[in-house]
Amino acid sequence: MLQPKRFKFRKMHKGKNRGLSCDNKVNFGSYGLKSIERGRLTARQIEAARRTMSRSVKRQGKIWIRVFPDKPITQKPLEVRMGKGKGNVEYWVALIQPGKILYEIDGISEEECRFAFKLASSKLPIKTIFVSKLVL
């Protein structure tokens, strides 16, 4: 699973997920999967989508993951009374704003890429669209 190797503080405030994403252009590959909704992706969801894409692409193309889960989500155990401090870190999430590029692919045809991204988007809890790199 994806998670930071080192971090300054183990636990974080919940915070807000406002604004639009700056990572809205395809940088590395030819095609990208772009979010059009706000939400959170867990490390498991990111990995599940990556696996489905890599199975679909096989060994032809190259896949880039443009999101990283760097926010810890804590949870208290079941049937524990309130108080006594914040719970333990249960999993890690990446906060997603509209317009963020989640994955990129290069080295395969557009039809294969669309099919791979369709499979990957079914594993994700947010709505996404297919985008291609603008070549001028």
Curated annotation (Swiss-Prot):
GO annotation terms (biological process): translation
Protein name: Large ribosomal subunit protein uL16
Domain of life: Bacteria
One GO cellular component term: cytosolic large ribosomal subunit
Pfam families: Ribosomal_L16
Function as written in the Swiss-Prot or TrEMBL entry: Binds 23S rRNA and is also seen to make contacts with the A and possibly P site tRNAs.
HAMAP family xref list: Ribosomal_uL16
PROSITE patterns named among the record's database cross-references: RIBOSOMAL_L16_1, RIBOSOMAL_L16_2
GO MF, any single term: rRNA binding
Keywords for this protein: Ribonucleoprotein, Ribosomal protein, RNA-binding, rRNA-binding, tRNA-binding
Family to which this protein belongs: Belongs to the universal ribosomal protein uL16 family.
